[in-house]
Amino acid sequence: MSRRRHSDENDGGQPHKRRRTSEPLEIEDRLESLICRVGEKSTSSLESNLEGLAGVLEADLPNYKNKILRILCFVARLLPEKMTVYTTLVGLLNARNYNFGGEFVEAMIRHLKETIKLNAYNEAIYLVRFLCDLVNCHVIAAPSMVAMFESFVGVTQEEDIPQVRSDWYVYAVLSSLPWVGKELYEKKDVEMDQILSQIEAYLKQRQKLHLSILQVWSAEKPHPQEEYLDCLWAQVQKLKKDRWQERHIQRPYLAFDSVLCEALQHNLPPFTPPPHTEDSVYPVPRVIFRMFDYTDAPEGPVMPGSHSVERFVIEENLHCILKSHWRERKTCAAQLLSYPEKNKIPLNYHIVEVIFGELFQLPSPPQIDVMYTTLLIELCKLQPGSLPQVLAQASEMLYTRLDTMNTTCIDRFINWFSHHLSNFQFRWNWEDWADCLSQDLDKPKPQFVREVLEKCMRLSYHQRILDIVPATFSALYPANPSNVIKYGDESNSALPGYSVAVILTNAIKNKASDKEIFNILKDIPNPNQDDYDDEGIGFNPLKIEVFVQTLLNLASKSFSHSFSALAKFHDIFKALSESDEGKLHILRVVYDVWKNHPQMIAVLLDKMIRTQIVDCAAVANWIFSPELSPDFTRFYIWEILHSTIRKMNKHVQKIQKELEDTKQRLAKQHKHRDSDDNDEDSGRKDGPLEEQIERLQEKVESAQSEQKNLFLVIFQRFIMILTEHLVRCETGGIDVNTAWYKNCRERLQQIFLQHHQTIQQYMVTLENLLFTAELDHHILTVFQQFCALQS
């Protein structure tokens, strides 16, 4: 079938020329649209659409073969939820054009090797699975697929490689068997038994030190939190026991069996897994998230058991939909709800479990947290009669299991739940959670409710929270977000610095200059006078207190007023924060003023770091200071610390990028000079760039040193406070496992997990200076678990 447009003989030359150049592009775009949209809603059946599309592509192969190959390789990698549709299409094309089938298989192998070398291991899994399904479509011969699996499993015998490398190749084999296991066993049962025996032996000797640091819950009831390879192995074993029969994979190629079975098959070329290099970054291990079982969905279809391969297939397909459509929540929600096998399963329960599984995934979710929030809101809008009830049931389950829930996951639960409530008028039956009122405030349940209400207030206002939450919860109400000023009341007139604060207030109101402000502050006596020279130069806590308290009070009307005040008096802040003690005291005063308004503290500190009034290390030291111990387990404290670390990391990355860009510019100049020998000025042009590179290298080294120091400060403080707790418990005969200890230890885990890519650079330093063999095993285990993630 040809879709070329033929011009009339009377057409002028120029229009004809224009059409001739644009016509191939139009056809290529149409081919891409046809391939990408096949299998979507249509008046005709999938089978007839596939047959028609195969005819169109066959007719266009002479002119657009390379384009068609590129598109098919693209959809194999990036549209895995429609994999069997595309394998069927390739099967039909192979039956019509054997040479094209061979070229496609070769292109897929090239793509697979390139994808692995680029560390795109999730996409590589989809390519392996696609190749496996081509066995079902009679494109690839089963023996050559078995040979590829043998080479994959052979990686487990390699020496001096990280376990995560072997894990990935084993997972690639096991996760493909639901699609191709039956076909391979029919053709090569002895070889497949050997492969599975090798995998079993590998799994038995495999280290799983990382397991507990990745689990959402520490308790094994009601659902075990299994390591991903262990769970998949159990599912494959059950599938094998059931003679490789599964009921949830859409297999459109069965309708074309009479055509496909006549096609000639291709042998895969011998596949050697790309070797391990220093640049190889493998996926970290996972824990399989379980929230529901068949008892939770009493009506309608039964939920498959946790070790049935159907559960794996359903979850894998839903994960694929999320991966393909996460950028557009409406499309994503519609795709999830139109899941092909939805009538066979309790779909809403599966969707909610998969979404929460991704949201709570450690070290980090596949997508940004807010995506899951907006997606669940969209799903509730599309299914108002059923999905909100499942979501409420899930929320209740999560609440009841808070005592054993990982602190990082509790943070994400708080963020999601408060954001979700804000989109539904904050409606919730709070009385159902009244059991938290009889517990100590440091326990997970009352802490959770308090933090949710704090977040809800950020998304509304204080009085609204008091109106919607019963008065019985008053102990957990957020504080009225007003400031606390020492010098704002005449009853405090006897306080040191009060009279200066009054003068300073009037001066700022009258738009005094920095010089005038400095002259006023000069009159404040220094409590540390004896420690400094006679002029009182140096850290003066009272001077800082009077200035910062006064300024923040005058600028307390809004965030914008506070930002303007910081900008206007930036030079004064810089002068007061010259020393480390000065920086720390500024942070203490900010906390004293705004202790009832955590959000204000967070945004002010963010601004102060950006404007270099304080540095990241000062914020870290402040967080672990005794003054902050009452709020140490509060959510906002850790928001501030992680935000501080991220700012430091971005600063380093920015300078590194500048350095790389400059090096590339210099390399281009050298290349240009080499190609133009007559350019006598080119040597002189290199000079400024080389000097710039030298300066940037110094900046990178300085920034990395600052970054390393920040992590050293944080981990050192963690070790100190945890050690103090352990010693105190040991000497007092008290149980170590208090609510505070669980929270603190899991916050340490959180630092490692959320910033694991950066921390990896400083592992040797951390191991030599802080996490030594002499350290208490309660603390050292956290470091060892982190190391196991990439070992």
From Swiss-Prot:
GO terms for biological process: 7-methylguanosine mRNA capping; mRNA export from nucleus; nuclear-transcribed mRNA catabolic process, nonsense-mediated decay; regulation of mRNA processing; regulation of translation; regulatory ncRNA-mediated gene silencing; RNA splicing. Belongs to the NCBP1 family. Residues 1-24, 664-687 are annotated as: Disordered. GO terms for molecular function: mRNA binding; RNA cap binding. Component of the cap-binding complex (CBC), which binds cotranscriptionally to the 5'-cap of pre-mRNAs and is involved in various processes such as pre-mRNA splicing, translation regulation, nonsense-mediated mRNA decay, RNA-mediated gene silencing (RNAi) by microRNAs (miRNAs) and mRNA export. The CBC complex is involved in mRNA export from the nucleus, leading to the recruitment of the mRNA export machinery to the 5'-end of mRNA and to mRNA export in a 5' to 3' direction through the nuclear pore. It comes from Xenopus laevis (African clawed frog). Keywords: Coiled coil, Cytoplasm, mRNA capping, mRNA processing, mRNA splicing, mRNA transport, Nonsense-mediated mRNA decay, Nucleus, RNA-binding, RNA-mediated gene silencing, Translation regulation, Transport. The gene is ncbp1-b. PANTHER family: CAP BINDING PROTEIN, NUCLEAR CAP-BINDING PROTEIN SUBUNIT 1. It is found in: Nucleus; Cytoplasm. Residues 641-714 form a coiled coil. This is Nuclear cap-binding protein subunit 1-B. InterPro entries: ARM-type_fold (IPR016024), CBP80 (IPR027159), MIF4G-like_typ-1 (IPR015172), MIF4G-like_typ-2 (IPR015174), MIF4G-like_typ-3 (IPR003890). Component of the nuclear cap-binding complex (CBC), a heterodimer composed of ncbp1/cbp80 and ncbp2/cbp20 that interacts with m7GpppG-capped RNA. Component of an alternative nuclear cap-binding complex (CBC) composed of ncbp1/cbp80 and ncbp3. GO terms for cellular component: cytoplasm; nuclear cap binding complex; nucleus. Gene3D superfamilies: 1.25.40.180. SMART domains: MIF4G. Residues 28-240 form the MIF4G domain.
